[in-house]
From Swiss-Prot:
Main location, first listed in the record: virion
Family: Belongs to the orthopoxvirus OPG108 family.
Pfam assignment, any one: Pox_P35
Entry protein name: Envelope protein OPG108
GO cellular component, one term: viral envelope
Knockout mutant characteristics: Impaired virion assembly.
Keyword Metal-binding: no
Length: 324
């Protein structure tokens, strides 16, 4: 018995080879490489083949692909994914990352997958690492059996959860819980028809506003989409915040603070990732991240209390030029 290969799609958010996201792929398939697919392209025919059921080599279940479309820096045709407000006030990084996913969902590639009756795709941003993919086969089967539309493989909120058994066998004990507003596009498995329906609804509604994750959750509720979140997701998908934090510092203007930040990222990756997270765009002129917001609040404090220290004003000025 045979079935169509499930696409495993790597979405680039940093400068990194897709094989680093799946470091063991070449050990299993000698001629395996990641085919690049961009706008207006479909899956290469040589990868669109069938696999034998229960093949002991799990890597042969999948067609490994790197998505290179949706680059808003090179093309303005993706502006319809965002409302006028978001096109002005959403940060460059937010629009860039979201556009890559929405352009993928709205691409000929996914229309072709629907025509060929491919049920699910696995999508992973390249700041993640999945060393062992053997959990995917039973997870995909369980998603089909339990009518799960989306399995999010990165947890945003920690705390007490009502967990449901997804897979229980001799190799895996996997649980999930129902998602709410804790939406992440970092790594997920999604039904092809669900993707097409979501992106169609986004476009018809005039594009996303600044509250992207709230809007996705709203659409899920309206369309009765079953999104589950993988419990203990870091066990299966390792997200490295250092990679994105370093990428952000590398794209800053070279200065003393950017070098300090790059060094601090190696020791405190989670903290620096949070501090460099962009929050809002100032009418498309520049983006303000967490550090920038702190600097703005500090400037307001100094103005209110009439601080006259030249050293403090000098240091604040260097922060402004570095982070705002």
């Amino acid at each position: 018995m045979a079935a169509a290969k499930t696409p495993v799609i790597v979405v680039p958010v940093i400068d990194r080879l897709p094989s680093e996201t799946f470091p063991n792929v070449h050990e299993h398939i000698n001629d395996q490489k990641f085919d690049d697919v961009k706008d207006n392209e479909v899956m290469p025919e040589k990868r669109n083949v069938v696999v034998v059921k229960d093949d002991p080599d799990h890597y042969k279940d999948y067609a490994f692909i790197q998505w290179t479309g949706g680059n808003i820096r090179n093309d303005d045709k993706y502006t319809h994914f965002f409302s006028g407000f978001c096109n002005t006030m959403c940060t460059e990084e937010t629009k860039r990352n979201i556009a890559r996913h929405l352009a993928l969902w709205d691409s000929n590639f996914f229309t072709e997958l629907e025509n060929k009756k491919v049920e699910y795709v696995v999508i992973v941003e390249n700041d993640n690492v999945i060393e062992d993919i053997t959990f995917l086969r039973p997870v995909l089967k369980a998603m089909h059996d339990k009518k799960i539309d989306i399995l999010q493989m990165r947890e945003i909120i920690t705390g007490n959860k009502v967990k449901t058994e997804l897979v229980m066998d001799k190799n895996h004990a996997i649980f999930t819980y129902t998602g709410g507003y804790d939406v992440s596009l970092s790594a997920y498995i999604i039904r092809v028809t669900t993707e097409l329906n979501i992106v169609d609804e986004i476009i018809k509604s005039g594009g996303l506003s600044s509250g992207f994750y709230f809007e996705i959750a709203r659409i899920e509720n309206e369309m009765k989409i079953n999104r589950q979140i993988l419990d203990n997701a870091a066990k299966y998908v390792e997200h490295d915040p250092r990679l994105v934090a370093e990428h952000r510092f590398e794209n800053m203007k070279p200065n003393f603070w950017s070098r300090i930040g790059t060094a601090a990222t190696k020791r405190y990756p989670g903290v620096m990732y949070a501090f460099t997270t962009p929050l809002i765009s100032f009418f498309g002129l520049f983006d303000i991240n967490v550090i920038g917001l702190i600097v703005i609040l500090f400037i307001m404090f100094m103005l209110i209390f009439n601080v006259k220290s030249k050293l403090l004003w000098f240091l604040t000025g260097t922060f402004v030029t570095a982070f705002i």
